[in-house]
Structure formats: C-alpha cells, structure tokens
Design a protein with these regions (language model features):
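Conserved mid-core segment of classical short-chain dehydrogenase/reductases
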Residues: 49-61, 110-125, 148, 169-172, ...
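Catalytic Tyr-X3-Lys loop
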Residues: 102, 110, 117-137, 156, ...
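C-terminal helical subdomain
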Residues: 203-204, 220-311
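Conserved glycine-rich Rossmann-like NAD(P)H-binding loop of the short-chain dehydrogenase/reductase
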Residues: 29-62
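Conserved glycine-rich cofactor-binding loop
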Residues: 15-16
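Catalytic loop of short-chain dehydrogenase/reductase
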Residues: 147-195, 205-210, 215-216
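Amphipathic alpha-helical dimer-interface segment in Rossmann-like NAD(P)H-dependent oxidoreductases
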Residues: 92, 96, 130-151, 188-193
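The beta1-alpha1 cofactor-binding region of Rossmann-like NAD(H)/NADP(H)-dependent oxidoreductases
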Residues: 54-58, 78-90, 121
Length: 313
C-alpha cells in the first residue's frame, strides 16, 4: 500500500445530488476521494453518460467514472450505513486504497417529514439507523485512523443548526438530525478537552433548498418551485471553505452554506447558485440561530468517565 500525496476524503452518501457534487468538487480541488453509498452499478454500461445526477442511474460507480475521466483520483465502495461492519470496511478500504484518511464527509441520510402520529415506528427506526447511528459508527471507525495520523483530520456532517422551529411537523426526522448536531457539538468539546487542536468536526445545512433527488418530486408536481432552488455547488463550495479554515474556526460549528460563505469566504453575490437565472431562492432557515452556551459553560463540575469507572469494577 502506497500513501497518496494528495489529501484523502471519504464521502458517505456520494452517489447523487449533493454528495456527488461534493465528491466532484473536492476532486477538482486536489483531493483523492473514496465514494461510498448503497447504490452501485456497472458504470461502463450507463447510457447516456454522465447520467442525470439526481436520478437512480447515478451511483458511486458513475461518479467515480466522471471523476476519473476528468483526470481526478477516485475509488468507490458499496456501504449500507445501517451495518457497522460495512461502515468499517468502507473506512478500511479508503486507507487500503489511498494509504491514509484526512477528511470524512457524512452525507448519508433518510428523510420522512410527518407528524408523530403518521410516522410508523419502522420508518422512525430506519431514520435513526441511517442518520445518527450511521454517523456515530462512521465517526468511531474513522477516529482510529485520525489517531494514527497524529490526530489530524476534518469531519463535516450534514446536520442543522439547533433551533426549535426545526422540530415542527417532522419530529421523528428532527430527533435524528438534531442528534447528529449534538454529536458535532459534543465531539468538538472532546477534541478541545483532549487538546487535539488539529481535529475539527463541523455541521452544515442548506440555507435555501438545493436541487437534488429529494426535490425532484416537488419540481414535478409544481414547476414554479424551481425558482426556490440552488445548485448543489453552493454546498460543496462551503464545505471546501470549511476544510480550508483553521480548525479553531470550524470545530463545533453548526452553520448554513450561505452564511459560512458570506461570513468566512467573502462571498456577497449568490446569484450564480440559483437554478433559475435571476431568481432569488427563498431562505428556509432562520436569519439568526439561538446561542447554545450558558453563563456557566466552563463549569464541568466533577468529571465522570464511565469507561474508567467500569474498569475499576
């Protein structure tokens, strides 16, 4: 196994839409990318090529082919994030292929927006498995390799800033997604406590809806909604900005693509990101988010570690 000179990113959920765009744009910016998702195919037989990026024809294999044909460095691995063994294999395969791991982007997700009454337990469990549990298992699998890299690495999670309006009308979905954001905040605190200053974990969420497989149905039922969509490269541009920023700036940050680009990358004109030229997509996120810190933030009380307590038993 030889170590790739360029930085290496593992992208979970890279088969289409936002994940595909993130993979392509990281490759264009010098990353070797491992594309991981459940959907696979024989890319050599895909016609037309490249396929519609928001269709089921787009898989990790077609994205790999797109990147390779553009001169980039990519590989693909099948993974069902409900299976911890498959997650471990995807992480191990990344290091077997490229010799190291520098960045994890967790874009895998399941969505169901409805009331508690109309969300079956089976659907709820599926979202928990793919969203917070899949993220947790992936992060744990990656931490071993970040440790071998002298605790140098970046994690970017597709999860929202925390605010109460997000819960309305989609409680079951929000429980998982906000749980992912809690992991971002909590692991960031761990990195600080453990003095791992070259590590960071960041959450990112779209300020306006992004054209993806999830928005295709809405466009079909109401074509006028297209004016409220942005291209997925706003998301990949923001992620690239996060990866370039100092860890102290992004560790524990929960932000939107637009706000990060404006406040940290100097972007003032977002018109090029609109799917419909000249349109200004409606912002779906609040203008400001609540501050989660309290006055006694630094008071940890008496520290406890269940691992150490268990070892003494």
């Amino acid at each position: 196994m030889s170590t790739t000179v360029q930085p290496v990113a593992l992208i979970m959920g890279a088969s289409r839409g936002i994940g595909r765009q993130v993979a392509i744009d990281l490759s264009k910016n010098g990353y070797a990318v491992m594309l991981a998702a459940k959907t696979t195919s024989d890319a050599s037989k895909t016609v037309p090529f490249p396929p519609d990026p928001n269709s089921s024809q787009s898989t990790v294999n077609t994205v790999e082919r797109e990147i390779r044909e553009a001169g980039g460095c990519a590989a693909a691995v099948a993974v069902d994030v409900r299976d911890a063994a498959q997650i471990q294999n995807a992480v191990d395969e990344t290091v077997r292929t490229f010799g190291k791991l520098d960045v994890l982007v967790y874009n895998s997700g399941a969505i169901w927006w409805s009331s508690v009454e109309n969300t079956p337990l089976k659907r709820f469990r599926l979202m928990q498995q793919i969203n917070p549990e899949g993220l947790y298992a992936t992060v744990q699998a990656c931490l071993l390799y970040f440790e071998k890299n002298s605790w140098k690495g970046r994690i970017v999670v597709v999860s929202p800033p925390i605010y109460s309006r997000f819960f309305r009308g989609k409680t079951a979905y929000a429980m998982g997604k906000v749980g992912m954001s809690v992991l971002v905040k909590g692991l960031a605190m761990d990195f600080v406590r453990q003095e791992r200053s070259d590590m960071s974990i960041t959450g990112i969420w779209p300020a306006s809806s992004i054209e993806s497989a999830a928005t295709e149905h809405n466009k079909a039922s109401d074509p006028s909604r297209k004016k409220d969509l942005r291209k997925p490269n706003i998301f990949s541009d923001a992620i690239l900005g996060m990866l370039r920023a100092p860890t102290s700036t992004v560790n524990g940050l929960l932000d939107t693509d637009e706000d990060f680009l404006r406040e940290n990358c100097g972007v003032t004109d977002f018109s090029n990101y609109s799917v419909v030229p000249g349109a200004t997509p409606r912002r779906i996120m609040p203008a400001k988010f609540p501050v989660l810190e309290v006055a006694e933030q630094d008071d940890e009380g008496q520290r406890m570690d269940s691992t150490k307590l268990r070892a003494k038993m």
